[in-house]
């Protein structure tokens, strides 16, 4: 018995080092995980307070329609209930999109480097992959991506801000792309880091569905909202796309706790504002530090920074582990001589700067 032939070419996702692993391997008490772009401030206190008063019937299947969260989110975003789908993280919706729209002989277009699961799930459906390198600053080259579309293109994957570079294209660039993109090609706009965008970079993406029937926008509660451990995200598009995805979605794909937690988190926008303010402050300070150190970096509109390292990113990663800092080496992201650093709390970032300064001094 064998699986699909393509699976012989793929590998399971390899997660980064976990805190418990570092504690065991290095005998450290002070450990800071800056590898997975999680929210260092956790999540809204209102979530814990509200959940403590809830009575969960764990022997009962969850609400397959995600009714309460659907109502809360559609009211906040001013969309119709038929225009939204929920998933176990927005990643599940990526998987649903591949299952729904990729047919034999299809190809998909994406940037490189970008979020790897676009490619992974597309390959599982036997799609041809067309990868267009980002420019030297880490931005999508939308004109070249447009030029690579042909009669067999099923999906174009756009990630903004892009993971791992942090770059975000402008609304004008996106509109030009969409105006020239064939209407039968699905355009997936992944805004996992949407809440971190500054207003001048906001694409007003939810309004695009009125003009472009081939666009779906993905967002998540895993990043700024801090609910990564509960796995819940959503997609917004016209009702025709949503109905198609619902046909391949599992009937109970988001759990009861995640649904409730997301609803309560959504109500606490002060927490999101605080997260944004602290992230911007600490990101800016870290950029200034790197400038003083003489290290380069990619501009970022998210809660992470892709840092250009003077030697192998893997070597920098290994060095930082010895001092309790977990980052993501660029060699695992397809960008050698870089590390991706999640922006942490102020004191943790100051400690990281001390270690990097020491490392740079040792390099001579």
Swiss-Prot record:
Amino-acid biosynthesis listed as a keyword: yes
Single Gene Ontology BP annotation: L-histidine biosynthetic process
SUPFAM superfamilies membership: PLP-dependent transferases
Transmembrane segments: none
Pathway: Amino-acid biosynthesis; L-histidine biosynthesis; L-histidine from 5-phospho-alpha-D-ribose 1-diphosphate: step 7/9
Lineage: superkingdom: Bacteria
Record InterPro entries: Aminotrans_II_pyridoxalP_BS (IPR001917), Aminotransferase_I/II_large (IPR004839), HisP_aminotrans (IPR005861), HistidinolP_aminotransfase (IPR050106), PyrdxlP-dep_Trfase (IPR015424), PyrdxlP-dep_Trfase_major (IPR015421), PyrdxlP-dep_Trfase_small (IPR015422)
Keywords of this entry: Amino-acid biosynthesis, Aminotransferase, Histidine biosynthesis, Pyridoxal phosphate, Transferase
N6-(pyridoxal phosphate)lysine modified-residue sites: 223
Cofactor: pyridoxal 5'-phosphate
Recorded catalytic activity of this chain's protein: L-histidinol phosphate + 2-oxoglutarate = 3-(imidazol-4-yl)-2-oxopropyl phosphate + L-glutamate
PROSITE patterns from the UniProt entry: AA_TRANSFER_CLASS_2
EC number: 2.6.1.9
Pfam family, one: Aminotran_1_2
Gene Ontology MF, one: pyridoxal phosphate binding
Recorded family membership: Belongs to the class-II pyridoxal-phosphate-dependent aminotransferase family. Histidinol-phosphate aminotransferase subfamily.
Subunit structure: Homodimer.
Protein name per UniProt: Histidinol-phosphate aminotransferase 2
Originating organism: Oceanobacillus iheyensis (strain DSM 14371 / CIP 107618 / JCM 11309 / KCTC 3954 / HTE831)
Chain's gene name: hisC2
